[in-house]
Amino acid sequence: MESKFEFAKELVKKAGQYILDHMQEDLQVETKTSPTDLVTRLDKEVQELLVSEILSRYPEDKICAEEGCLRASVQEGKVWVIDPIDGTNNFVAQQEDFAVMMAYFENGQGQFGLIYDVVKGDCYHGGGAFPVCLNDKPLAPFKAKPLGDFLIAGNSGMLETNEWGLADLSRAVLGVRVYGSAAISFAKILSGRLLTYVTYLQPWDYAAASILGESLGYRVVTLSGETPDFQTRQPVMMVPLEMQEEIQSYIYERKRT
């Protein structure tokens, strides 16, 4: 597993460098499910790079990835979960606050995850048998304090409509931030800058964070407190275990108002 983990760390940085080398070119921006659901040429090319490198090294492994039709179940065999560019809208509009994410599972058990903030060069990596680090610095486990002392992150639409009670939760904390990227939001939780992140996500958006967070006292759950299915888009949050009940008291089964 050590060699596979080292391979993954090198690979996300290779993907990040590919983005940096080509991000000033024509991105060929297209829309997918809505005008704000963007995909670029580099999303596709970076995914192709990652998949090609993985399968050339580990031909028996399977892939679940954002672009295209690669949808292997993490419950069966050796599976890589890939988000080639998380925060594509940020990438297109700002050319910062986006990341490459990868996670590796064996028969449903997360072995390690990686979140690579391409512009900052920050790589969050580890989980499973590996310590969770930011670059080479181990990250501290969650440390509790009063709810009102924390910032949280969320989905602006959910906040506006109080869907799942997110606005109620926001009034109980210090403030809310909207970063436009699951990867960036999760990275801020892992580094102790946020308490939780509440939104709708696909499996490739939360897979890496679910593995990284577990080693630091966090878990990714649906908004009803269950384990995500790792197959469909679901309302989820990343929360510290010791404050999950308090956080969930604001949002458990709270629907759109």
Task: Please report, for each region that a protein language model flagged, where it lies by residue.
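N-terminal subdomain of lithium-sensitive/metallo-dependent phosphomonoesterases centered on the IMPase/IPPase/PAP
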Residues: 1-85
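Residue-level signal for inorganic ion chemistry
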Residues: 19, 43, 54, 88, ...
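A short, compositionally biased
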Residues: 25, 98, 126-130, 214, ...
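Generic detector of well-ordered alpha-helical packing
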Residues: 44, 67, 84-87, 118, ...
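DPxDG-like acidic metal-binding loop motif
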Residues: 74-130
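Short strand-turn-strand beta-turns centered on an Asx-Gly dipeptide
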Residues: 107, 135-136
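Short, solvent-exposed loop/turn motifs
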Residues: 110, 138-140, 227
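An extended, acidic
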Residues: 142-257
